A protein has these predicted regions:
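Bacterial Sec-exported substrate-binding components of ABC uptake systems
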Residues: 2-36, 43-96, 212-252, 372-377
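Short helix-initiation/N-cap motifs at beta->coil->alpha
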Residues: 69-71, 129-143, 187, 287-294
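A short, structured surface patch at a secondary-structure boundary
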Residues: 91-150, 154-155, 159-163, 314-316
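Extracytoplasmic ligand-binding site segments that recognize negatively charged/polar headgroups
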Residues: 112-116, 161-169, 179-209, 242-269, ...
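Structured C-terminal subdomain patch of bacterial secreted/periplasmic proteins
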Residues: 197-206, 308-377
């Protein structure tokens, strides 16, 4: 019995020791497991942080200095996150760069149709500082109080009036308040256009500068490369044409009036579109963006093609109706009888936003126009 009792005592002792060992082992396992999970979570957070940094441009951002149309040099210390954009053409560039989430506000509500339909939802969600768009109202500058109320870390403009109009905040005033600004080179920058516009370098410089400012240079290069490929596909066919083989084109901006037409000269974006597409602007000898001419001068230059340009109405049906209205004016105007483009009804169609405003859609305009010109030479 004593022997049996001692055996049971030893058995209980060994069982207790094993239980303690298992408890200690399980505790160690649990601690190790928790540590492993924590490490995974921390690694995941770090990866997410790095991914977010790459996505928003903050990862490894080095301060840069960028120079704009006015020669204003702005130091960008970190990618802007609360941007105010004062003109639709520059807003569109940001949208092509997938930077719509950085826009805190726009100046005036964009005119319907002025931006691609694909961006409509994003644009509708952006607050306007100068109120709703009103047809014929002209540019409404953003008052100082309204602009500063959104605490912008960057202000972007496309026209000098964005900063110079009465009531607008100047770039100097913005700088005094510690807010950098940038006036685009490709929209209406006279100082940047010192020779005829025959390409899209100014657009590419703006896109590249915006890519640097926001820390997304790779996105900018993809957008630029997409434009280059479209342009190259046309230049491969039209680039070798002699001037005499290029159809002459009168770019007619219908919405600017019909009594005395505005003739885009060689400093205007549409000149680059026409030249790249394989045509010749009949007013390409004018070293200015626009000049008012009489219809008799259009008749004297006798264009082979009239490029009808209208403001985008926001839908294909509305645009077609407006193009048809413009073409009806041309074919019924007594002043234009005998003009080759009119008698042959050789009309090409482009919306103003892709043809006459420097931007990403210029490359699409080139492709569209080239198709029409190839059968009109």
């Amino acid at each position: 019995m004593h022997v049996l009792a001692r055996w049971f005592d030893r058995r209980r002792s060994r069982t207790a020791d094993v239980s303690r060992d298992r408890a200690g082992h399980n505790g160690t396992v649990r601690v190790a497991a928790v540590a492993a999970v924590a490490a995974v979570l921390l690694a995941g957070c770090a990866d997410a942080s790095r991914s977010q940094g790459r996505a928003d441009g903050t990862s490894g951002f080095t301060p840069i200095t960028v120079t704009d149309c006015n020669g204003v040099e702005s130091v960008i210390k970190s990618p802007p996150k609360r941007v105010v954009v004062l003109t639709p053409s520059v807003l569109e560039m940001l949208l092509w760069l997938d930077l719509g989430d950085r826009v805190a506000a726009i100046g005036q509500e964009p005119r319907p149709g002025s931006l691609p339909q694909r961006f409509a939802e994003q644009v509708a969600a952006i607050p306007s500082l100068s109120g709703k768009y009103t047809a014929g109202s002209g540019y409404k500058p953003v008052p100082r109080e309204e602009l500063l109320s959104v605490e912008p870390d960057l202000v972007l403009g496309g026209f000098g009036s964005n900063f110079d109009a009465a009531g607008a905040m100047s770039q100097k005033e913005l700088a005094t308040d510690g807010i950098p600004s940038y006036l685009a080179l490709s929209t209406a920058c006279r100082s940047a256009v010192t020779a005829p516009r025959t390409g899209f370098d100014l657009v590419w410089r703006d896109v590249e500068n915006l890519g640097r400012i926001f820390g997304v240079p790779d996105r900018a290069q993809r957008v630029i490369e997409g434009m280059r490929q479209k342009v190259a596909s046309v230049r491969a066919k039209a680039g070798g044409l002699k001037d005499t083989a290029r159809p002459t084109v009168f770019p007619f901006e219908y919405d600017e009036g019909t009594t005395t037409p505005y003739a885009p000269g060689n400093r205007q974006a549409v000149n680059a579109v026409i030249e790249t597409a394989g045509g010749r602007n009949v007013f390409g000898d004018r070293d200015e963006a626009y000049t008012k001419v009489g219809w008799e001068e259009v008749v004297a230059r006798d264009p082979q093609v009239i490029l009808v340009i209208v403001y985008d109405r926001g839908s294909p049906a509305a645009n077609d109706a407006h193009f048809a209205e413009a073409e009806k004016f041309l074919v019924t105007s007594p002043a234009l009888r005998g003009v080759r483009a009119v008698t042959g009804k050789r009309f090409a169609r482009l919306v103003y936003e892709s043809a006459s405003v420097g931007g990403v859609r210029n490359a699409d305009a080139v492709v569209e126009l080239a198709g029409r010109l190839s059968s009109a030479g």
